[in-house]
Curated annotation (Swiss-Prot):
This is Telomeric repeat-binding subunit 1. Coiled coil: none annotated. Keywords: Chromosome, DNA-binding, Metal-binding, Telomere, Zinc, Zinc-finger. Changing F293A: Abolished single-stranded telomeric DNA binding; does not affect telomerase activity of the holoenzyme telomerase ribonucleoprotein complex. Residues 229-301 bind DNA. The gene is TEB1.
Length: 701
């Protein structure tokens, strides 16, 4: 079942994978069953009903300081929910994002049979009795009747009034500062006036230009619909695409005066607008709608009329009421005594952009935007604030579609993979050229944060080149705190398996074989995929990593980790209920002896015992909660001082390695199973045995 925006649906039929960002489910509050308020959150339990008469039990979660109050008969639109389950034949849903249903503008011609168009203009209560046989049609009729009673707030009425005012005042506005607007802009009316129904008149261009010009930071979803002006410079233009309904569309990326970027998508008169827009030029975009696309905003030009007005054309024919200022995008570029007209500024910036596209290094514009002059490691990409950079990395995963190519790349600088998204035209050029495990140069890519994750994407300056030095990367599991190593394919690198040095401890019932770190690494690298093996080693604990997360949450039911939702509420998918989780420690550190060092993961029981050994006042069962409280209260220094007492502390470690395969790569993870206090007597016997072994080897040689 395909969802449509504003449609009425039975929640138990909704597949989470089909719940897209732009689609919303309409529900009506039938009864308020209870509510709970904490310091920062408010939880309201309601019995709701949809347009088909199906009931659901919904838990609403909202900020306590927003003063939002749900009441009976309120109509809300569910925009995002975390899960749903059945309880007493009712669907139970945890809703995290919603809005009150506000409807005063409907387009019956475009509304589908089970779809209503709901916009943020005026709150309208839809009574349950109004929703009968066909909920969509009844809602449409009700809203139409309601609009007649509230005609002063109707968007259609406002548009009609605006048209009438334009006609009445058209003669007075024909001439501004000696220029005849209708004559001056008749040459661009054909390429900038799109759509079937006219909301804007080219003769009233001065009215349009007087609309508020917003920056990207000022854009809000549902506000100023069709009634604002956005000024931007086109920095990227995609190819045209065709969707399943055989309609064309394309998108661009534009920069505002603060160098922020936003995507603009165009769905009407695609061929004309595609020819109008040129990369590197400034335009006024009038009549767009701000939409939420995943975690980013975009301007969508699909419903209603819109106009694209080249700013270069305006500077030649129109004296703008506001004084034109030099573009802020030039940073410290010296303009001198040159003309401050927009025409000259566009020519200058277009020339600079062209130099950057041709790869010249004297690109001031790009340098002011933190252009990278050398190839960075992935670990540097994750930390840098540079916007443009280059990377040499190995491709470990490829996902290709008609619209883009999505890669995962890695190198030996850290344990994290980096996502790369390649859009047209590089997408078409490299669609069949990437190979798993090969190394490539990704030159002049744009660094962006998407879903709290660092990614790279291409623009018009980006290029890709296959590296001449192909290397093999052995990846050690990131979750268990270990490293990566790259080996040149062209070299003669190999692993030498040395004779095992061991000592059997006959003083205890348990027979132990002690190994060195070097021996453990050798056996791990020579092992087969799927193999596990345990070792005992005398070693020092060094460098517990404070930069990594030190704890996680688990449910008592099956010991599975749980997700932390907004506020302090936790929901276990196994129990299907809200829980009070347990806090467990997970420490990443290094174990070292005289032969080498390996990174290890130390989980809750062993980590808690270490903390208890340093400070006996911290009970083993309370160590996780103690660390969590210190971090949340900004007392990381206490934890840092606590861990510093463990630096180079000597223990007997039981260590397990596991050889895995992930994405056609070899992964070796080391985990600490047991930690014991050092035994000087037993270690002395082990060292004596090791010394005898070395002496015998030297005599034989």
């Amino acid at each position: 079942m395909k969802l449509t925006k504003g449609g009425s649906y039975i929640l138990k039929k909704v597949d989470r994978k089909q719940f897209y960002q732009d689609e919303e489910i309409v529900m009506q509050i039938k009864k308020i069953l209870g509510q709970k308020t904490t310091d920062c959150k408010q939880y309201i339990k309601c019995e709701c009903i949809d347009g088909l008469g199906d009931e659901a039990l919904i838990y609403f979660e909202m900020l306590a300081n927003q003063n939002q109050h749900l009441q009976k008969n309120d109509v809300i639109m569910i925009q995002d929910y975390l899960n749903d389950k059945t309880q007493n034949d009712k669907i139970v849903v945890l809703v995290t994002r919603f809005q009150f249903c506000k409807a005063s503008h409907v387009q019956p011609k475009t509304a589908q049979k089970e779809s209503i168009q709901l916009l943020n203009t005026e709150k309208t209560i839809i009574q349950k009795s109004k929703i009968t046989k066909n909920p969509a049609e009844e809602v449409l009729k009700f809203i139409e009747v309601n609009e007649k009673d509230n005609s002063s707030n109707s968007e259609d009425m406002i548009i009609e009034q605006q048209k009438q005012e334009i006609k009445n005042n058209q003669k007075e506005k024909q001439s501004i500062n000696g220029f005849n607007l209708e004559d001056s802009y008749s040459n661009i009316s054909d390429i900038t006036n799109f759509g079937g129904k006219s909301n804007f008149n080219i003769g009233s261009l001065s009215d349009q230009l007087s609309k508020q010009t917003l920056l990207i930071s000022q854009l809000q979803v549902g506000k100023n619909r069709f009634s604002f002006k956005f000024e931007g410079r086109v920095v990227y233009k995609s190819s045209t695409f065709q969707n399943q309904q055989d309609s064309k569309y394309f998108f661009i990326t534009a920069q505002d005066a603060n160098n922020q970027e936003i995507n603009l998508s165009f769905w009407q008169k695609v061929d004309q607008s595609y020819q109008t827009l040129k990369v590197g030029q400034y335009y006024y975009f009038i009549g767009g709608e701000v939409k939420q696309f995943k975690n980013n905003l975009e301007l969508k030009f699909k419903f209603g009329d819109y106009q694209i007005i080249p700013k270069e054309t305006l500077s030649a024919n129109y004296v703008q009421p506001l004084a034109l200022q030099p573009s802020k995008q030039f940073g410290n570029d010296s303009i001198g005594d040159s003309d401050y007209s927009i025409h000259n500024l566009i020519e200058k910036e277009e020339s600079i952009a062209q130099k950057g596209y041709n790869g010249q290094k004297n690109n001031k514009y790009r340098q002011n935007n933190n252009n990278s002059k050398h190839t960075l490691l992935i670990s540097e990409v994750l930390k840098t604030s540079k916007q443009y950079l280059s990377v040499l990395a190995q491709v470990v995963d490829i996902q290709s579609s008609d619209k883009n190519i999505r890669l995962k790349i890695c190198d030996n600088s850290c344990n994290q993979e980096l996502k790369v998204v390649i859009f047209p035209d590089l997408c078409y050029e490299w669609r069949d050229k990437f190979s798993i495990n090969k190394w490539y140069y990704f030159n002049e890519f744009v660094r962006q944060i998407y879903n709290d994750e660092v990614q790279l994407k291409n623009n018009i300056h980006s290029s890709i080149k296959e590296s001449d030095d192909q290397r093999k990367v052995i990846t050690y599991n990131q979750e268990q705190g270990v490293f990566k190593k790259s080996i040149s394919i062209n070299s003669n690198d190999s692993f030498e398996i040395k004779p095992k040095i061991s000592y059997k401890n006959n003083s205890n019932q348990e027979q132990r074989i002690y190994s060195s770190i070097e021996e453990i690494i050798q056996q791990a690298q020579a092992s087969e995929i799927g193999q596990k093996k345990e070792f005992y080693v005398y070693g020092n604990l060094v460098s517990i990593q404070m930069k990594n997360k030190l704890y996680y949450y688990r449910c008592t039911c099956q010991g599975k980790s749980v997700l932390k939702y907004h506020g302090d509420s936790f929901f276990c998918e196994s129990c299907q209920q809200f829980i009070n989780p347990q806090v467990h420690l997970m420490l990443r550190a290094f174990v070292q002896d005289s032969t080498g060092t390996i990174p290890v993961m130390i989980f809750d029981q062993q980590s808690s015992q270490l903390i208890n050994q340093i400070d006996p006042s911290i009970h083993v069962q309370e160590a996780g909660q103690y660390v969590k409280n210190c971090i949340e209260n900004g007392q990381e220094e206490i934890i840092r001082q606590l861990f510093s007492k463990l630096d180079f502390a000597r223990f007997i470690f039981e260590i397990q390695f596991e050889n895995k395969e992930f994405n056609n790569e070899q992964e070796i993870a080391y985990k600490v199973l047991k930690i014991e206090k050092e035994n000087i007597k037993e270690e002395s016997k082990y060292l004596l045995k090791k010394l005898e072994h070395l002496i015998n080897n030297n005599q034989n040689n």
